[in-house]
UniProtKB/Swiss-Prot annotation:
UniProt-recorded Gene Ontology molecular function terms: RNA binding
Coiled-coil residue spans: none
Chief localization: cytoplasm
Biological function: Required for rescue of stalled ribosomes mediated by trans-translation. Binds to transfer-messenger RNA (tmRNA), required for stable association of tmRNA with ribosomes. tmRNA and SmpB together mimic tRNA shape, replacing the anticodon stem-loop with SmpB. tmRNA is encoded by the ssrA gene; the 2 termini fold to resemble tRNA(Ala) and it encodes a 'tag peptide', a short internal open reading frame. During trans-translation Ala-aminoacylated tmRNA acts like a tRNA, entering the A-site of stalled ribosomes, displacing the stalled mRNA.
Originating organism: Dichelobacter nodosus (strain VCS1703A)
Protein name: SsrA-binding protein
Family: Belongs to the SmpB family.
GO terms classed as biological process: trans-translation
GO CC annotation terms, alphabetical: cytosol
HAMAP family (alphabetical): SmpB
Source organism phylogeny: Bacteria, Pseudomonadati, Pseudomonadota, Gammaproteobacteria, Cardiobacteriales
Entry-linked Pfam families: SmpB
Keywords recorded for this protein, A-Z: Cytoplasm, RNA-binding
Length: 159
């Protein structure tokens, strides 16, 4: 039996996180979903752009994740698209996340969702907010790398 392509395991990525935060440490967390939510995630009807993670009572929760219900899968219940979802982590990981989130300027952000052995996993990152000048500096660096690659490409053509 061949191994599945890892690109197929990808569900969604929060691209805004890379622009607004410096990501320092990543954790893999499970997520407690209801049946209709799993079906909607399989259909790709999830959005984590405006979501964030908070710690309450020694438990970690995902807020603001929007899962649009499928009409066929959620006809017998009243689905709540933007409910709070519990993240499943080991106790030592929760302790590390609590310590990181209490530091000044740090927060917990969901980076991506993906499938692993049939379960939905969340990539949780300890993030530090970027200032406006940090964003400008990153943009300058990206522009310089693009220019540099163009120069190198043009130079190789001349040889």
């Amino acid at each position: 039996m061949s191994k599945k392509n890892t690109a197929d395991n990808h569900i969604v990525t929060n691209k805004k996180v890379f622009h607004d935060y410096f990501l320092e440490e990543h954790f893999e967390a499970g997520i407690a979903l209801e049946g209709w939510e799993v079906k909607a995630v399989r259909a790709g009807r999830i959005q984590i752009k405006e979501s964030y993670i908070l710690v309450k009572d020694q438990q970690v929760y995902l807020f603001g994740a929007l899962i649009h219900p499928l009409a066929s899968a959620s006809s017998h219940i009243f689905p709540e698209a933007q409910r709070t979802r519990k993240l499943l982590l080991h106790r030592y990981q929760i302790a590390k996340l609590i310590g990181a989130s209490e530091r000044d300027g740090y927060t917990l952000m969901p980076v991506s969702l993906y499938w692993k052995n049939g379960f939905v996993k969340v990539d949780v990152a300890i993030a530090k907010g970027k200032k406006e000048f940090d964003k400008r500096q990153v943009k300058k660096d990206q522009d310089w790398k693009k220019t540099q690659s163009r120069i190198m490409k043009a130079h190789k053509r001349q040889l």
